[in-house]
Each structure stands twice: as structure tokens, then as C-alpha cells.
């Protein structure tokens, strides 16, 4: 009983020590992940401390920051601070879900391409064709056919990002499938699904996580760009791209209407990139030494 109690009481200290050790060895993971976690918490708790981002008051157009309106108001009298905070929800949702969709699709297609010589050439030629089309242009084409919407926006961003993930996973599968322990497992009678699950898929996770961070950052920027030109998030939904587009004519009068969403967009993308760099250094220490 005493031994069990000692272990139970020591476990939090062990976990704390592990977190501190990771923070010391990989500060980029702590910095990028901390900023991203803070942004997520602020976005989730927005109703607790900010106003309604949709309420318009024509008598409070383009007002300067005040105690009730921390970032002032836009050209329609809406609270810029509230719209900036709620806009974080859109950017984070689109970025994270686009990265997840691209990662899942790229993982499945990449494994098939890496292990099936029959479909490898067909799949990779299709991926090459998709990669030859600029992401922004392909997303605009898809959104033009369906109209604006968050769901279709996520799909439109994920599709052009999938080929890069597919090529990465395929290269890992081709490398791992020829290793002795994989061949030994197959010769020992292990079935292919079991070999994929136990030996090959775990090898794809670290590079897939790093690539997903890159996709997430790219998706956030793409969403902002598409919303800026009016084909992304519907105009009635608060979005950093919409805010910048609607306020660009009032930069001299109310600079915070552009600076607030622009700064949040830059910080979010920077945090995701820092997290991706930190994960790369964590999974591949040689990359850190080369730099």
C-alpha cells in the first residue's frame, strides 16, 4: 500500500519533470504550442468576455478604442475586438480541419501508392496533376462551383494540400517496407494489414505531424485570402480575411480595424510554423544540428 501511494504521489512530479525537460530541449514546441493553445482558449471563451460581433450601430461608426470597445468599431458600427476574437474561431477551425482532412486522405492514398505497384503510377500522376495547379486557383474554382461556405471551404483547401502529404507518406512507406524487420515479419507469416499497422504506419506519424502543421498554416492563410476576395467565408460571418477586406478603405481613420485581424493572423501562422519546426527538431534531431 505504501509503495502504491508513493508511486501515485510521485507521478505528477514525474510528469512535470517530463514537461520541463521537453521545454528545455525543444523550446519551439513550447512556444508555438503555448501561443496556439492560448488562441484556442480565447476563441472558445469569447462569449464570456466579448460582445456580439454581429450587432451593428450606425451611430457608432469608426469610433476610436474605448473602455467598452477595446479596438473601436468598424464602418458599420460593429465591435472590432469581438469580431477579431470570433474570427479566430473560423481561422482555427478551417486550418485544423483542413490539415486533418489532408493528413487522413494523404495517409490512406500514400500507403496505397507505396505498397501497390499497380496503382502507384496512376495515383502519383494524379497527384502531380493536382500539384501543378496553384492551391489558391484550385480553391477558387471549387468554391465558384458550389458557392461560399465553411464546409466546402475546408474541402477546397484540403484537396490541393493532399498531394504533398501523399508524396511524403509514399516516400516513407517505400523506405520502411524494404527494411529487414518488415521483411522478416512478412516471411514469418504476418499478414500485410498487421505489418502495415504495427511497423509501417507508426513510421509515418512523425513526418505526417510536421507536414500537417505546414498544411494548417497554409490553410489559415488561404482561408484569409479567399475571404478577402469574397469567395471564402460568407460575409456575414466574422473572419479575419473579411475584416481586412471590409476595412481597407478606412485604414487612415480606424487603423485597428485592419491591424487587429492582420496581427492575429500573423501571430497564428507564426505559432503554427514554430510548432511544426519544434516537432521536426523533436522527431529528427539531425535537422537541428544541420541548422
Curated annotation (Swiss-Prot):
Pfam families per UniProt: BPD_transp_1, OppC_N
Record bears the keyword RNA-binding: no
Coiled coil ranges: none
SUPFAM superfamilies per UniProt: MetI-like
Annotated keywords: Amino-acid transport, Cell inner membrane, Cell membrane, Membrane, Plasmid, Transmembrane, Transmembrane helix, Transport
Limits of the ABC transmembrane type-1 domain: 88-276
Compartments, record wording: Cell inner membrane
Membrane topology: Multi-pass membrane protein
GO CC list: plasma membrane
One annotated GO biological process: amino acid transport
Family indicated by similarity: Belongs to the binding-protein-dependent transport system permease family. OppBC subfamily.
The protein's role, per its UniProt record: Probably part of the binding-protein-dependent transport system y4tOPQRS for a peptide. Probably responsible for the translocation of the substrate across the membrane.
Protein name: Probable peptide ABC transporter permease protein y4tQ
Biological source species: Sinorhizobium fredii (strain NBRC 101917 / NGR234)
Amino acid at each position: 500500500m505504501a509503495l502504491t501511494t508513493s508511486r501515485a504521489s510521485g507521478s505528477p512530479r514525474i510528469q512535470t519533470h517530463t514537461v520541463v525537460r521537453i521545454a528545455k530541449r525543444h523550446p519551439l514546441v513550447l512556444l508555438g504550442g503555448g501561443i496556439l493553445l492560448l488562441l484556442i482558449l480565447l476563441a472558445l471563451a469569447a462569449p464570456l468576455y466579448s460582445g456580439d460581433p454581429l450587432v451593428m450601430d450606425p451611430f457608432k461608426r469608426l469610433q476610436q478604442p474605448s473602455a467598452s470597445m477595446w479596438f473601436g468599431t468598424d464602418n458599420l458600427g460593429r465591435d472590432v475586438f469581438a469580431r477579431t476574437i470570433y474570427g479566430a474561431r473560423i481561422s482555427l477551425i478551417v486550418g485544423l480541419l483542413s490539415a486533418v482532412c489532408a493528413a487522413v486522405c494523404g495517409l490512406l492514398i500514400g500507403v496505397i501508392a507505396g505498397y501497390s505497384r499497380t496503382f502507384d503510377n496512376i495515383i502519383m500522376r494524379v497527384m502531380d496533376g493536382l500539384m501543378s495547379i496553384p492551391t489558391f486557383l484550385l480553391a477558387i474554382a471549387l468554391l465558384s462551383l458550389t458557392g461560399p461556405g465553411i464546409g466546402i471551404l475546408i474541402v477546397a483547401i484540403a484537396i490541393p494540400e493532399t498531394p504533398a502529404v501523399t508524396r511524403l507518406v509514399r516516400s516513407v512507406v517505400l523506405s520502411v517496407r524494404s527494411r529487414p524487420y518488415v521483411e522478416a515479419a512478412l516471411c514469418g507469416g504476418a499478414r500485410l494489414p498487421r505489418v502495415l499497422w504495427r511497423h509501417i504506419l507508426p513510421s509515418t506519424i512523425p513526418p505526417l505531424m510536421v507536414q500537417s502543421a505546414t498544411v494548417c498554416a497554409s490553410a489559415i492563410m488561404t482561408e484569409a485570402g479567399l475571404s478577402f476576395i469574397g469567395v471564402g467565408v460568407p460575409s456575414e460571418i466574422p473572419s479575419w480575411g473579411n475584416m481586412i477586406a471590409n476595412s481597407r478603405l478606412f485604414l487612415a481613420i480606424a487603423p485597428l480595424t485592419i491591424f487587429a485581424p492582420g496581427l492575429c493572423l500573423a501571430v497564428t501562422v507564426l505559432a503554427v510554423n514554430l510548432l511544426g519546426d519544434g516537432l521536426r527538431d523533436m522527431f529528427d534531431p539531425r535537422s537541428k544540428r544541420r541548422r
